Amino acid sequence: MSPPAHSPRGPRTSAARPRVAFLGPSGTFTEQALLSQPDLAAAECVPIRSISETIFEVDSGRAELGVVPIENAIEGSVNETLDTLAFEASEHLFIHREIVVPVDLNLCVKPGTKLSDVTTVVSIPHASAQCRDWLATKLPGVEVQASNSTAEAARHVSKARTAGRAAIAPSLAAKLYGLEVVAAGIHDHPDNSTRFWMIGHGIPARTGHDKSTVVVFQTHQDRPGGLLTILQEFNARGINLTKIESRPTKRELGSYCFIIDFEGHLSDELVADVLRSLAAKHEVRLLGSYAAAGREAGARRQAVGKAWREASRWVDGLRARVQLP
């Protein structure tokens, strides 16, 4: 899908009540992620039909911020989010923070429907996959249909004329659309959670507990050791990687880029230094430097940063002793 025409004028301004787009309709885990942020309690929350459209809503300036899913603990990355941000959105759009929400998946039906009545299950493919074993055991042979979101599945079931349809959705969506939970907690793994990105224009200030995400396009893909040379840049500076994966660049068959999450913020000298080195050798795009959901990253970065500063002072002391010609 191509992005709508937009200009890099930045977001519309509304300090009192920011407009925040999210993957809708109401009742999605994405909305739960948005509502979990105290500083957005007064925001105008706008449900959008798809992930890419949510991103373009912010990119165009029609919304100040947006919230989209990026990774599930069981099913991995949400490729639509990665690809839209990496290849289609403008370079004025950045990740502002990450939000982690525990996943609570239930089988939701119209009131009075029994589990034995269910013939069709509807949900977003990521959610259906997280319940694969449960479905195979409890509803073998059931037809599984795709929707844009868990809440969209719940809304679809609420409007269905037949009683044999069920939605895999959170309890919030079941309540919102007048459905009953016929089976609760049907996800196959108990410690399931989903990570979300909040996106907006500009790069937010350093918090001390930050992560960054960068896309690296290899200049020479036919040379061995390409990934190793990229990883060595981070290792040499003591920067911890939290995630790395490859994605097709959409340019030609066999052409891949690396999307890397790592600890630290652009304002950190070590992070700025690794980006300089990468950009000198490869095509690089920074997707964001943003507040991390946990505080472990900050503690590690502070320790590494202190060691690096001490080493820099030592080198500066030696250089000060160099005699002038």
Q: What spans do the regions from the language model cover?
A:
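Domain-level signature for soluble enzymes in the chorismate/prephenate branch of the shikimate pathway
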Residues: M1-P325
